[in-house]
From Swiss-Prot:
Cofactor requirements of the protein: heme
Organism: Phomopsis amygdali
Family of the protein in this entry: Belongs to the cytochrome P450 family.
Membrane topology term: Single-pass membrane protein
Gene null: resulting phenotype: Accumulates fusicoccin H.
Localization per record: Membrane
Glycosylated residues (UniProt): N81, N168
Gene3D superfamilies with a match to the protein in the record: Cytochrome P450
Protein's GO biological process: secondary metabolic process
Protein's name in the database: Fusicoccin H C-9 hydroxylase
Amino acid sequence: MAKFTVTSLERHLLLISTVIAVLAALIVSRGCNYLLKRWKLSAYPLYEDKKVTPIEELHSSRDLIAKGFAKSQGKEIWRINTTIGEVLVVSPKYIEKFRYGHGCSAAAYTERELPISAPGYEPFTFASNEWRQRNADIILHRLTGLVSNRKIELSEELSNALESRWTNSTDWHAVSLFQTMTAIVAQTTQYFFTNRELCRNDAYIQSLFAYSSLAFTEGRSLMKWPRVLHPLVARFHPASQNLQSALENVNKHIFPFVRERRAEISRRRFEAAQSGKETPLADEWVAWLDEKAGNEDYNPGVAMVSFSVASFHTTTDFMCQLLCDLARNPAIIEQLKEEASDVLRDHTWTKSSFARLDLMDRCMKESQRLKPIGAVFLKSRAQKDISVENGNIIPAGSLFVVSGHWMHDPAIYPEPEKFDPGRHLRHAEESKPNKPKQFTAVSPEHMGWGYGKHSCPGRFFAATVAKMLLTHILFKYEFKLPDGKLNQHAYEFTTEILVRRRIEEGALNLDSFDSIDR
């Protein structure tokens, strides 16, 4: 029998042929997957196919969403070309398909929206990796409980923050609505993450503001480069260097604070062990993070920015809009004061008293309905084919958002542009008695806080802060919009509001309140 041998050249040719065959198979496979995806997407109408829409416009423009559905020929899903690629806009009719987040990745969507692989964007990576659920647990189960048990401290910090920005002048004077609300919200929320000294440190608060601003403005300029080059380009790009410097400024404040708190926690635990006492519970932000991290190393400055960016923006945006809505409806201000005077007449902050501020709760829900934080929600990337109704499929690899246009649908909310807090009571009692009407509740008809697994975990904390802040404003200040702004529904970053300290605060002296949990 003949003996066959393989020369070195033949072995190399065989290896090269195998590699080429594998690469060809991968290319063909990817090509087929791409064509299959395009075929599935072709079932949905494309909005203005020759136009590339800024992704920020899609996220915020109710008019764009309305036009998209109007041009979609009755389809409940349509496509739009944006600066981050093609995005599917899905009707809230299908929201239940995404309740549990199966097959959806919010982190993958963020990767297309921001250059989070670049140095300086670590807080966004921190919020989207395995820490995502840990952060949600901390906010929902630890932070919410902490603020519930420390209402007096919350009231004191709100009082200080409000007086520092709106002053005690009894003469009418103009203040920047957005800037003052941002500062008040930042100081108050940071009190529960840090301490009184740091939350009142203007340099520290400004370092957080600077990072947040740069991340969403200058930092976006990196998106002009291919994503694979972001880590390299960031080493030389001025915007990325500015962002990294802003993060370092936050670290200068946070690192010493964390070292101090860890030392204090260790000291208390050591003393308890020495005396045979039970280990004291460290109910504070540093301890929560260390507990979640276990033996894993993490950057506390990155963690702080990750927690802060979202809370500043959402709560500030909401409070600005709420005050504008109330200023346009001054009769409701007096009704709110009457309700608070009755509910809080025993001069205590309690869980039950917050729950009984029903008119305030409905005003907040209505203001959020009129101007939610965005026009779309549940921004995600499909990790697999997601089947919805009537054979509709969200193809794997597709970017998609769920529209919030039901919040302005006249079939659900008659006269949808009207500020009518009573509609939520009627909606719950008449049309859908099983629908929750509370400000923090979520539903397909009201996705101001998101929906399902994507619901904002900080909404209970934010609602508590907002209710107490509004109560302080109602009894301590008069406020109104300047002439010419009364018919402008949505506030702008440049909007000013006229305020003056009340000479008589009425029956409630909020600064003398007690706190009893019942």
